[in-house]
Amino acid sequence: MPSFLTWLGGAAALISVAGCGQAIIGSFLLSRFRWQERRPPCPDASNLPAVTILKPLHGDEPLLSEALESVCRQDYPHLQIVFGVQSTEDTAISHVRALQARYPTRDITLVIDPQQHGINRKVGNLINMYAFARHDVLVISDSDIHAGPHYLRDIVRTLESPQVGLVTTLYAGLPASKTLVREMGAIQINHNFLPGVMMSRLLGRRDCLGATMALRREILEQIGGLEALVDHVADDAVLGHAVRALDLDIALAPCLTWTTIGESSMRELLLHELRWGRTVKNLEPVGYGMSAIQLPLFWATLTLLCCHDARWAWVFFGTVWLIRAMTAIGVNIATAVPAWAMLPLLPLREWISAAIMVGSARGKEVAWRGQTLHIERHVPVTNLRQPLEPGD
């Protein structure tokens, strides 16, 4: 009669097989997404609506100048760029001043305002910046996001549909340098998160990915403005929830962006991932638990530990590793972020991810830029600062 360990190893193997299937499908969907990322004939510039892009800043960070400059290099004619900080001593100011000098013809505004509006300082910063936004199409973009020159055109084209209330973009991890810690951080995003997002969209989920959030001013005002988000840690999730309550869709722009992976120590990386894990777990506990399927090498290793005397377990582990490596190569090509040296470390990366999931199971507090914040579940739309009614 099979022992408990044999049963456990068999169950882990089944989950690992499902994880391999998810990795293959997710990698294929991502590659297809990039292949379809074509440049249509550029429309007449006079037909493009004016856009205000809001970039909240907080201190210096690796590749900050490069990320901010990618906004200044947009192939978009009617563009206002608003940067915001909350202290005159903020080290990000020097980067903005340099861009203003380098791009004198660009409409670049720097807002320095210490006023706080709630627990979410990023949204508080955005509230201060919003007062200077002149245009009706608004794009909120994180400070560490690198974008191609057609980023705004792709977003605006997607937002043109009357059924679309919010546009977001995929993002890949871009290591600020070739260090083990930063490569590990990029693997988590590129090989686990990205294929998982593609798979979830195939199954019908329409989440707001907070690195880019674009919407029309009228929609923002209907949901209660930025003030409706300022008392929530997961402002992107709350915004997406509110837009869907208006019976509007969350669309994905046909472009990929890149987020800087700038952690300098393993402790810093683990705390970052733990913060992200706890946030997602508290917002979507079932979905977060199901995401464990994205770790086929973890489950294959568990199979090997339970059935180490069985030859099939070793063959199975090697096969899963090979499949995982092949899908990782496909993702590397699709994201244009080479990480070939990390392929032998994929099992270690997945065990770290599993440990993060276990650590995320308890606790509703996260550390973020010097703050300790409490994460809440999705609030009902009626609890936002202004009630929402579909069709308003």
Positions of predicted regions on the chain:
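Acidic donor-binding/catalytic loop of UDP-sugar-dependent glycosyltransferases
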Residues: 91, 141-158
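Membrane-embedded multi-pass helical conduit in multi-pass membrane proteins
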Residues: 4-7, 14-17, 28-32, 290-367
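Long helical/loop segments within the catalytic core of UDP-sugar-dependent glycosyltransferases
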Residues: 98-131, 135, 154-223, 227, ...
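Acidic donor-binding segment of Leloir-type glycosyltransferases
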Residues: 68-117
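Short beta-strand-to-loop acidic/aromatic patch adjacent to the donor-nucleotide binding site
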Residues: 126, 135-146
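Acidic donor-binding loop at a coil-to-helix junction in glycosyltransferase catalytic cores
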Residues: 232-238, 253
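N-proximal low-complexity "stem/linker" segments adjacent to membrane-targeting elements
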Residues: 1-69
